[in-house]
Amino acid sequence: MVSSIESSVGTERKLVTAIPGPKSVAMHERRKKSVSAGLTQGFPVYIERAEGAILQDIDGNRILDLGSGIAVTTIGHAVPELVAAVSEQVADFTHTCFMVTPYESYIEVCEELSNITPGTHAKTSALFNSGAEAVENAVKIARLATGRQAVIVFDHAYHGRTNLTMALTAKNMPYKDRFGPFAGEVYRMPMSYPFQDGLSGQEAAARAIKMIETQVGAGNVAALLIEPIQGEGGFIVPAPGFLPALSEWTTKNGVVFIADEIQSGFGRTGEWFAVDHEGVVPDMITTAKGLAGGMPLSGVTGRAELMNAVHEGGLGGTYGGNPVTCVAALAVIRVMRERNLIARARELGDAITGALKVLQQDVAIIGEVRGKGAMIAMELVMPGTKEANAAAAKSIVSYCNSQGVIALACGTYGNVIRLLPPLTITNEQLADGLSVLATAVRAAG
């Protein structure tokens, strides 16, 4: 293992070979012989080290990261405080299983989650390994606490790849195709999608509520599960008033409001959580991704009376809340505070949105620029329409890849380009990435 000084990869994007380079090509041949073909690969290189917003591949190319490992490395790569915390913990002990012999860092993470999640009510948390596991446990808790079974989800939603979370997820390919049968008592409602439906938040909420009450019945609903800003579904930001109206309805009807903040949480949108933008206080909130800076940790935080309704032994998992992941999460939270990264997310969002809106004036394929904080996207359309233009998105991602810039596509129809830079990216790095992206968009449009 090399030190952080020895492993410095520089701060500028730099290509020394074509993408992919010869070593990555050879590595990919090895991969095909031993790794399941069911795993995709968005960027065709193999990484050996990373620092800040730069990844270095095995050919020596420096790649600019505008994806953060899908909103995970929010504080950047190889942050010294995180590296030190993890290294020290590994030297002490790596695992005991919290359910067998517990440790303080698990409790500290739960205390921090109580502090930073919305609301001043009493809360408790349980820690797990992945976002899907957190969502699955949130639903499990809601069903037990309410004595009801039905779960409301929304069009374009993504909640994971386990059997239950596949049922909760909207898009078939690649997430669900031929993996059924899926868990039952899941009911899908229309999402507020201002660019496509033109409805106000109140109108969109009334539409969804009417369908719930007519097709499911409020008294049968255990939980309403929603991403405050949808992630894989296309960075869809609901119209103002949509989330508050749903929250009000759930409170009135004894339904547990679960905010899936796995992609949108931990400062990504310019607040600790996306629901904070409209003052929504969920009954439960799921976290993962940015929570632990790349370590596999997730959490469910909720009203104490809900979380504590579960019988002893009803929650858990061998690795959930592993001590190494817990100290990583504590380091992430410290760095977020000390470097004022939530404010930085707002600055980045202003810069990205401004640049993309200028580009939109000249390029007809950009239907909408949307998002909050450093969670910004472009929806690409056929010129003069709102019809999805997935071919343009594919072309843009391919060009960015060839230039050593990671840009990710998403959306139910594959026509959205999303930007999720580390919050520690420099202004110069961001400008460089946006310049490459602009060239790609102009070529595609």
Which residue stretches match the model-derived regions?
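Conserved N-terminal phosphate-binding loop of PLP-dependent enzymes in the Aspartate aminotransferase
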Residues: 2-445
